[in-house]
């Protein structure tokens, strides 16, 4: 299915998917995925934006998904007299947790299964002085023979 790129911009500070937790209840282990910390709200917002931008059926072809995660600056990173460039984000959340939350949120809206996402880049940055925190997701199909080396 030839397709133009789909670009989604999700406003707000990026969030990572919390890792599954295990607890012992009555001598039995029970595993659950925590959903606090705004995760459910982020997923709902991402799904709403995706449904507005992409109105076709969920894709069932190999996909490339690139993600740019722009985090807010801390007070210690604020400058008053000089331009503030983007900085690499070297603290949590880990990039795999950021990616997992985005892929899970868009499953069933943009693609049938996140296993269809075969490649893509991720970048975590701290916002430049004039940037707002956000997550930018760029989705494109992979043409036959077009896989990256």
Predicted regions span which residues?
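Acidic, proline/glycine-enriched N-terminal capping motif
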Residues: 1-149
């Amino acid at each position: 299915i030839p397709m133009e790129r789909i670009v989604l911009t999700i406003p707000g500070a990026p969030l990572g998917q919390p890792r599954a937790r295990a607890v012992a209840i009555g001598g039995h282990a029970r595993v659950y995925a925590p959903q606090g910390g705004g995760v459910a709200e982020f997923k709902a917002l991402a799904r709403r934006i995706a449904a507005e931008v992409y109105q076709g059926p969920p894709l069932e072809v190999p996909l490339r998904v690139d993600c740019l995660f722009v985090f807010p600056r801390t007070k210690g990173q604020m400058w008053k007299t000089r331009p503030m460039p983007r900085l690499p984000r070297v603290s949590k959340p880990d990039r795999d947790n950021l990616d997992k939350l985005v892929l899970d949120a868009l499953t069933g809206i943009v693609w049938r299964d996140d296993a269809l996402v075969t490649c893509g880049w991720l970048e975590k940055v701290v916002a430049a002085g004039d940037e707002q925190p956000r997550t930018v997701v760029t989705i494109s199909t992979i043409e036959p023979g077009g896989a990256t080396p």
